[in-house]
A protein has these predicted regions:
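Structural preference for beta-rich elements and adjacent junctions enriched in aromatics
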Residues: 1-275
């Protein structure tokens, strides 16, 4: 049988990106600058491409991943000639600004983080509804479905997903998250030309317990373990026609206007090679 028959998702399985995450010998300072040697030596992603078509984006965006026994580290380099942001309240709808996004998937749940050039964070924890009881989430007070900020979610452009509906926890905050943004220019001042902004994240492994529990994955990962992650950028502007710019760019495209497809997330392998 061909992949088009057996693979029910809108981007070829063979085209999903893979990445090797190196260990850090000295943890980076989370200041958003990405100027430590470990970030300079870490393999960077290719230039992000359009989320739907895979065509080159008008501005350069790249990401890299590092790790140690305590944290998962993620860095973004964002070319932006006119850096802009408006939202300052935590869990505001950051995708209505220009942002970068991180998704991390477990077997039965996934985590979403968005951040703008002000460093404002938006987070959601999603659980597949069909796994809610089976995976043990129903027994955890933190995932009581009667709480404020809990509601069903059916995805965005890829519907219906083969696994069905998710339960979203919009009040959930990643335990111990550290984040920082550095703007190389002047934010919200379009009288000059900026170079862009960089984002630095440190997510402690203990914060992934709810994600890791259903399949018993090791925290921190064992060398050779593979996790699914997604890295993207969304803009309130688009390249002029004839460019086919959806306004969403990703390390590994999805073929549809929807980041919420864990099966299309990048395969990140944790290496013992260090930087």
């Amino acid at each position: 049988m061909t992949e088009s028959i057996t693979w029910p998702f809108p981007w070829p399985q063979s085209a999903i990106a893979q990445y090797t995450a190196y260990r850090v010998n000295t943890p980076p300072q989370i200041d958003g600058r990405l100027d430590e040697a470990c970030w300079q030596q870490a393999p960077r992603s290719p230039r992000f491409a359009d989320l739907i078509t895979g065509q080159p984006a008008i501005h350069d965006t790249r990401a890299a991943v590092l790790w140690d026994d305590d944290y998962l580290y993620v860095g973004y380099w964002v070319e932006e000639p006119f850096v802009e942001a408006t939202l300052t309240e935590r869990d505001a709808l950051i995708y209505e600004d220009n942002d970068v996004e991180l998704f991390v998937a477990g077997q039965d749940a996934y985590y979403e983080l968005e951040i703008n050039a002000f460093g404002t964070i938006y987070e959601v924890f999603f659980i597949w509804e069909e796994a809610f009881d089976r995976a043990g989430y129903a027994q955890q007070p933190a995932f009581d479905r009667s709480q404020p900020g809990v509601r069903p979610f059916d995805g965005v452009g890829f519907q219906p997903h083969p696994r069905g509906r998710r339960i979203g926890y919009w009040h959930w905050d990643f335990p111990g998250l550290h984040s920082a943004v550095h703007v190389d220019g002047t934010i919200n001042n379009n009288q000059d030309r900026d170079r862009g902004w960089t984002v630095e994240l440190a997510l402690p492994w203990h914060g992934f317990r709810a994600l890791a529990a259903p399949d018993g994955r090791a925290l921190p990962p064992r060398p050779g373990d593979v996790w699914r992650m997604d890295f993207s950028r969304f803009n309130q502007y688009k390249a002029a026609p004839p460019a086919q710019d959806s306004g969403g760019w990703a390390w590994s495209p999805h073929g549809v206007w929807d980041s919420h497809v864990p099966e299309l997330f990048i395969q990140v392998c944790f290496s013992t090679e260090s930087v």
